[in-house]
Structure formats: structure tokens, C-alpha cells
Regions:
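C-terminal "cap" of GNAT-fold acetyltransferases
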Residues: 155-171
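Conserved active-site alpha-helix within GNAT-family acetyltransferase domains
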Residues: 122, 134-153
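Conserved acetyl-CoA-binding loop-helix of GNAT-fold acetyltransferases
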Residues: 96-99, 105-118, 141, 145
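A short beta-loop-alpha structural element at the N-terminal edge
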Residues: 1-18, 28-30
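Active-site rim helix/loop that mediates acceptor-substrate recognition in acyltransferases
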Residues: 29-57
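Conserved acyl-donor/pantetheine-binding loop and adjacent beta-alpha core of acyl/acetyltransferases
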Residues: 63-96
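Conserved beta-strand-loop-alpha-helix junction that forms the acyl-donor binding cleft
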Residues: 104, 130-140, 158
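Conserved GNAT acetyl-CoA-binding A-motif
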Residues: 120-132
């Protein structure tokens, strides 16, 4: 039985090890752009990052999911969508999902996103935004299944083509 838990900054290194392992094992490197540890740490330190882990019954960590609460920070994907300032403040970025190969097949990306969505709804966030490489059928299928809508395709993260997806969770 695998459970999803929300954790604090004290488990960030552990989560980042998963990001590194997944990054190194990517068959199509363009599909996954691993941010540096300092990027995750910045958001956690600011109190604007949410970190989720998937752990098995032996407490082995097999997946991580990171949410950024960007506010008016220039990294907010809402700027790409020409959102107004009040909308930007209600955006959460479903930023990074990484699942170790031995934990795949359990829909962990989906489950972690669902946990985050429930927390974000409770916190009053209205817009969930994420990016997916246009050819990454796995992530694309995952966000479509959760009700996200593709709004834009553009270069992000130093020249990588990405689709920007959005889901409105509060009317």
C-alpha cells in the first residue's frame, strides 16, 4: 500500500534525490527538465512550496510532487496566459512530478496531484497551472484525465517547447 504524504523542507533532499534519479534515467531528456535543488529550496524557504511524497509500507520513498505558490513572482505561468494581477495571486503551479521506475504503474503522479488539488482548494487557490512537453503522452494523458485544458504552446525553461495547461478548481 502506497500513501501520499505532505512533508516539510526537512525532506527536500530526499525528494530531490528522486528528481535526480528520474532525470538521469529519462529516455527522452527534453520531456523532463530538472530544476536545481536551490530552486525547490527557495520556494520551500519562502513558505511558497508544497512537497508531497509517495511512500510504501516500509517507508521507502518512490515519488515526489512539488507545487509552487508563485503569487506575483515572474515565474508564474499565469503571466504567459495574460492573467490579471488578482488572478495571478490565485494561481498554483503543479511544478514537478518524479516517480522512480520501481514505483511506476500505481498512478502516483495522478494521486499526488489529486492530494495537492484538495489542499489547494482548501487554501483558496483557483487556478492550477502546469507545463507538459507536447510529445509526453503520459503526462499529457494524466493532466487531461484530471480536467486540465491546454491553453498555449511556447518555449519555456531555456528553450524547451511546452504546453501550458490550466484547471480552474473554484468557480
Amino acid at each position: 500500500m502506497i500513501k501520499i504524504i505532505r512533508v516539510g523542507r526537512e525532506r527536500l533532499r530526499e525528494a530531490y534525490e528522486i528528481v535526480n534519479k528520474v532525470d538521469q534515467g529519462m529516455n527522452v531528456p527534453e520531456w523532463f527538465v530538472a530544476e536545481p535543488y536551490e530552486e525547490f529550496d527557495f520556494w520551500m524557504n519562502e513558505g511558497r512550496g508544497l512537497l508531497y511524497l509517495a511512500v510504501d509500507e516500509d517507508e521507502n520513498v518512490g515519488a515526489m510532487f512539488f507545487v509552487i505558490l508563485p503569487g506575483l513572482h515572474p515565474d508564474n505561468l499565469g503571466y504567459d496566459l495574460n492573467m490579471e494581477e488578482e488572478q495571478l495571486k490565485l494561481c498554483a503551479m503543479m511544478d514537478t512530478a518524479a516517480v522512480l521506475p520501481e514505483f511506476r504503474g500505481h498512478h502516483l503522479q495522478y494521486e499526488m496531484m489529486q492530494h495537492a488539488e484538495a489542499d489547494l482548494r482548501e487554501m483558496g487557490y483557483k487556478y492550477l497551472l502546469c507545463t507538459v512537453h507536447p510529445e509526453n503522452i503520459f503526462s499529457r494523458s494524466n493532466v487531461m484525465k484530471q480536467g486540465y485544458e491546454k491553453l498555449l504552446t511556447k518555449e519555456k525553461y531555456g528553450g524547451f517547447l511546452r504546453d501550458i495547461w490550466m484547471k480552474q478548481i473554484i468557480e
